[in-house]
Protein backbone atom coordinates (compact mmCIF):
# COMPACT_ATOMS: atom_id res chain seq x y z
CA UNK A 1 0.00 0.00 0.00
CA UNK A 2 1.05 3.56 -0.65
CA UNK A 3 1.06 6.64 1.54
CA UNK A 4 -0.91 9.74 0.56
CA UNK A 5 -1.57 13.20 1.95
CA UNK A 6 -5.01 14.54 1.09
CA UNK A 7 -6.22 18.08 1.73
CA UNK A 8 -9.76 19.07 0.86
CA UNK A 9 -11.62 22.35 1.16
CA UNK A 10 -15.30 22.36 2.12
CA UNK A 11 -17.87 25.08 1.39
CA UNK A 12 -18.31 27.24 4.52
CA UNK A 13 -22.10 26.72 4.52
CA UNK A 14 -21.43 22.98 4.92
CA UNK A 15 -19.02 23.27 7.88
CA UNK A 16 -21.47 21.39 10.12
CA UNK A 17 -21.27 18.43 7.73
CA UNK A 18 -17.46 18.13 7.95
CA UNK A 19 -17.38 15.54 10.79
CA UNK A 20 -19.82 13.31 8.88
CA UNK A 21 -17.78 13.69 5.69
CA UNK A 22 -14.57 12.82 7.53
CA UNK A 23 -16.22 9.72 9.03
CA UNK A 24 -17.38 8.62 5.57
CA UNK A 25 -13.88 9.03 4.09
CA UNK A 26 -12.33 7.29 7.12
CA UNK A 27 -14.77 4.44 6.58
CA UNK A 28 -13.67 4.14 2.95
CA UNK A 29 -10.01 3.88 3.96
CA UNK A 30 -10.45 1.59 6.96
CA UNK A 31 -12.98 -0.59 5.14
CA UNK A 32 -10.32 -1.51 2.57
CA UNK A 33 -7.71 -2.40 5.23
CA UNK A 34 -6.06 1.02 4.95
CA UNK A 35 -4.67 3.13 7.78
CA UNK A 36 -5.09 6.75 8.78
CA UNK A 37 -1.81 8.08 10.16
CA UNK A 38 -2.87 11.70 10.69
CA UNK A 39 -6.19 13.54 10.54
CA UNK A 40 -6.32 17.29 11.12
CA UNK A 41 -9.26 19.67 10.97
CA UNK A 42 -7.75 23.07 10.25
CA UNK A 43 -11.11 24.80 10.56
CA UNK A 44 -12.37 27.78 8.62
CA UNK A 45 -9.60 29.77 6.94
CA UNK A 46 -9.22 32.58 4.45
CA UNK A 47 -8.73 31.39 0.86
CA UNK A 48 -5.80 32.72 -1.16
CA UNK A 49 -8.25 33.63 -3.94
CA UNK A 50 -12.05 33.48 -4.20
CA UNK A 51 -13.58 30.20 -5.35
CA UNK A 52 -17.17 30.55 -6.61
CA UNK A 53 -17.30 34.00 -4.93
CA UNK A 54 -16.39 32.43 -1.57
CA UNK A 55 -13.55 33.92 0.49
CA UNK A 56 -13.40 31.46 3.42
CA UNK A 57 -13.62 27.67 3.54
CA UNK A 58 -13.19 24.75 5.92
CA UNK A 59 -9.90 22.81 5.52
CA UNK A 60 -9.27 19.14 6.38
CA UNK A 61 -6.02 17.21 5.97
CA UNK A 62 -5.53 13.43 6.11
CA UNK A 63 -2.42 11.25 5.83
CA UNK A 64 -3.52 7.79 4.80
CA UNK A 65 -2.09 4.47 3.70
CA UNK A 66 -4.28 2.71 1.16
CA UNK A 67 -4.43 0.98 -2.19
CA UNK A 68 -5.01 2.57 -5.58
CA UNK A 69 -8.67 1.49 -5.72
CA UNK A 70 -9.45 3.11 -2.37
CA UNK A 71 -7.77 6.36 -3.42
CA UNK A 72 -9.77 6.40 -6.66
CA UNK A 73 -12.97 5.82 -4.66
CA UNK A 74 -12.17 8.76 -2.34
CA UNK A 75 -11.30 11.08 -5.24
CA UNK A 76 -14.50 10.02 -7.02
CA UNK A 77 -16.46 10.92 -3.88
CA UNK A 78 -14.74 14.34 -3.79
CA UNK A 79 -15.65 15.06 -7.42
CA UNK A 80 -19.34 14.31 -6.91
CA UNK A 81 -19.69 16.07 -3.55
CA UNK A 82 -20.73 19.67 -4.24
CA UNK A 83 -19.60 20.74 -0.76
CA UNK A 84 -15.95 19.93 -1.60
CA UNK A 85 -14.64 22.98 -3.43
CA UNK A 86 -11.10 21.68 -4.08
CA UNK A 87 -8.98 18.69 -3.15
CA UNK A 88 -5.32 17.78 -3.53
CA UNK A 89 -3.73 14.35 -3.21
CA UNK A 90 0.04 13.95 -2.89
CA UNK A 91 1.87 10.62 -2.88
CA UNK A 92 4.25 10.44 0.09
CA UNK A 93 7.36 8.30 0.59
CA UNK A 94 6.46 7.34 4.17
CA UNK A 95 3.76 7.75 6.78
CA UNK A 96 3.69 11.21 8.35
CA UNK A 97 2.40 11.32 11.92
CA UNK A 98 3.81 14.53 13.42
CA UNK A 99 1.64 17.66 13.53
CA UNK A 100 1.58 19.83 10.42
CA UNK A 101 2.85 23.43 10.50
CA UNK A 102 -0.79 24.60 10.46
CA UNK A 103 -1.54 22.71 13.68
CA UNK A 104 1.73 23.78 15.31
CA UNK A 105 0.75 27.39 14.59
CA UNK A 106 -2.68 26.83 16.17
CA UNK A 107 -1.13 25.15 19.21
CA UNK A 108 1.26 28.09 19.62
CA UNK A 109 -1.68 30.51 19.48
CA UNK A 110 -3.57 28.41 22.03
CA UNK A 111 -0.57 28.36 24.35
CA UNK A 112 -0.25 32.14 24.13
CA UNK A 113 -3.97 32.81 24.64
CA UNK A 114 -4.30 31.37 28.19
CA UNK A 115 -1.25 33.30 29.35
CA UNK A 116 -2.70 36.59 28.11
CA UNK A 117 -6.11 35.68 29.62
CA UNK A 118 -4.46 34.90 32.94
CA UNK A 119 -2.64 38.24 32.88
CA UNK A 120 -5.83 40.24 32.28
CA UNK A 121 -7.71 39.24 35.48
CA UNK A 122 -4.73 40.12 37.67
CA UNK A 123 -4.46 43.51 35.96
CA UNK A 124 -8.20 44.10 36.47
CA UNK A 125 -8.06 43.05 40.13
From Swiss-Prot:
This is Small ribosomal subunit protein bS6. It comes from Laribacter hongkongensis (strain HLHK9). InterPro entries: Ribosomal_bS6 (IPR000529), Ribosomal_bS6_sf (IPR035980), Ribosomal_S6_plastid/chlpt (IPR020814), Transl_elong_EF1B/ribsomal_bS6 (IPR014717). It comes from the Bacteria. NCBIfam families: S6. GO terms for cellular component: cytosolic small ribosomal subunit. One of its GO terms (biological process) is translation. Gene3D superfamilies: 3.30.70.60. Coiled coil: none annotated. Keywords: Ribonucleoprotein, Ribosomal protein, RNA-binding, rRNA-binding. Residues 101-125 are annotated as: Disordered. Belongs to the bacterial ribosomal protein bS6 family. GO terms for molecular function: small ribosomal subunit rRNA binding; structural constituent of ribosome. Binds together with bS18 to 16S ribosomal RNA.
